[in-house]
């Protein structure tokens, strides 16, 4: 089915689109252009939506805004925004009455005419997705990047050619209701995350598993052999399994031998590059490259991989060097919205650092983070709703002694950053690596990271 054929099938149906945000706005415009009866639903007020509300209404949309935006859903087809659970009472009631529940990404999987690689995991998704996309581009392929990053791809599907590649980053929220899988699926790692939304860890893992659950023989699934959960998932994959590992040498996949990154495929082993070729800091980025190499095996020449690794500076908000100020290096690692991500960031630095952490409570335990902070942090500056929980995890960790590390609780966010600056000495590293989501003070981790950068870059020499 093509995108146009799908849209034609909706012309005599009513459609609701929940969420007037970045991912759904192009969809709304396209539906309205096709003359489809559309209701646009959003919790935001008309004032907050601004000119977009006027534009949609002028194009023929019915707006359903505010706290009751989910009430009375009776449309034939309902597009769910990824952040909304599919089992909220209003959606369940609509489905009982005959409504079809779908999403922008689910329909894209139905109509996408080209090859598809999708990446999920708790950490490393964006960097791995970006590496895969850039490697394919460097090899001369036409690439479309979407999902959690890039552009919404559904409305671009008719412009894609069969030989193109769609490279997607998919979250557990997007995957929850998926019933199709990509040609090449990558699971970077899995650890507790988003437990404020998911019922439990089992539901979170099950959602992630949809990325490879519906593959067919001949498809490819890439897993982290060093992660307990993903190693078990590899045994349930239908497609060809490729593993990546820093600690062992899988029969099929990518692994580390000393400082060399090697690939073993169909019984043949070859050296791709060394870890020194990777410009990005941290062992977690070695893992990101190994996952990407496993995904593009046979598609990208080894020399292109090596040349790219030597020059790629990474993605914004991921251990991003913001500035050196009075001899102190400031890093923006705002993407670190889970303990495992912060741990990876801390391990990237050879010295003990000044850490700014804390934020929105996703109900993730911090017990694994405590010992890492004791080992890698000289001063801990806490800010946000989880400050008390992180402090408790550190103070209860083995090896903790009073003031080792010293712990400060400072609000608001700007003052926390300034407190880190005031305590830092030449040669120190200050890193924003919160271990939490940003929603208690910011719209998202990107706004938090940009705010941090603006504060640091605003200081006069």
Residue ranges and their predicted role:
Residues 1-103, 107, 301:
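N-terminal leader/targeting and accessory segments in enzymes
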Residues 31, 78, 119, 148, ...:
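Residue-level signal for inorganic ion chemistry
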Residues 178-181, 211-217, 235-237, 348-350, ...:
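Short, conserved loop/helix-junction motifs that constitute active-site signature segments
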């Amino acid at each position: 089915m093509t995108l146009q054929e799908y849209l034609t099938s909706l012309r005599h149906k009513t459609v609701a689109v929940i969420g007037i945000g970045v991912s759904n706005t192009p969809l709304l415009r396209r539906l309205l252009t096709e003359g489809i009866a559309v209701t646009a639903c959003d919790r935001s007020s008309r004032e907050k939506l601004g000119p977009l509300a006027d534009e949609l209404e002028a194009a023929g949309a019915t707006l359903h805004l505010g706290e009751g935006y989910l009430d009375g859903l009776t449309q034939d087809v309902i597009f769910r925004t990824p952040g909304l659970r599919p089992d909220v009472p209003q959606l369940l009631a609509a489905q009982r009455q005959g409504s079809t529940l779908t999403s922008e990404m689910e329909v894209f999987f139905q109509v996408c005419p080209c090859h598809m690689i999708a990446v999920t995991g708790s950490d490393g998704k964006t960097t791995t997705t970006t590496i895969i996309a850039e490697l394919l581009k460097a090899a001369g392929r036409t690439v479309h990047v979407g999902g959690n990053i890039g552009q919404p791809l559904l409305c671009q599907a008719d412009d894609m050619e069969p030989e193109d590649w769609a490279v997607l980053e998919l979250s557990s929220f997007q995957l929850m209701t998926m019933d199709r899988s990509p040609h090449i699926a990558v699971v970077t790692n899995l650890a507790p995350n988003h437990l404020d939304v998911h019922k439990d860890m089992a539901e979170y893992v099950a959602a992630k598993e949809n990325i490879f659950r519906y593959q067919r023989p001949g498809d490819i699934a890439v897993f982290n052999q060093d992660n307990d959960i993903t190693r078990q998932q590899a045994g349930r994959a239908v497609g060809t399994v490729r593993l990546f590992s820093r600690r062992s040498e899988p029969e099929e996949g990518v692994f580390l031998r000393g400082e060399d990154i090697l690939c073993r495929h169909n019984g043949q082993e070859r050296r791709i590059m060394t870890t020194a070729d990777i410009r990005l800091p941290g062992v977690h980025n070695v893992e990101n490259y190994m996952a990407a190499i496993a995904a593009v095996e046979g598609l990208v020449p080894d020399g292109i991989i090596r040349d790219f690794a030597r020059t790629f500076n990474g993605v914004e908000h991921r251990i991003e060097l913001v500035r050196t100020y009075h001899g102190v290096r400031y890093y923006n690692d705002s993407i670190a919205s889970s303990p495992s991500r912060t741990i990876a960031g801390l391990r990237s630095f050879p010295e003990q650092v000044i850490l700014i952490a804390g934020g929105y409570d996703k109900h993730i335990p911090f017990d694994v983070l405590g010992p890492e902070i004791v080992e890698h942090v000289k001063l801990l500056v806490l800010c946000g709703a989880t400050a008390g929980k992180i402090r408790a995890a550190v103070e209860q960790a083995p090896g903790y002694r009073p003031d080792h590390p010293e712990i400060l609780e400072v609000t608001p966010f700007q003052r926390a950053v300034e407190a880190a600056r005031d305590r830092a000495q030449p040669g120190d590293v200050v890193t924003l690596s919160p271990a939490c989501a940003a929603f208690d003070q910011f719209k998202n981790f990107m706004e938090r990271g940009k705010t941090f950068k603006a504060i640091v870059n605003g200081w006069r020499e």
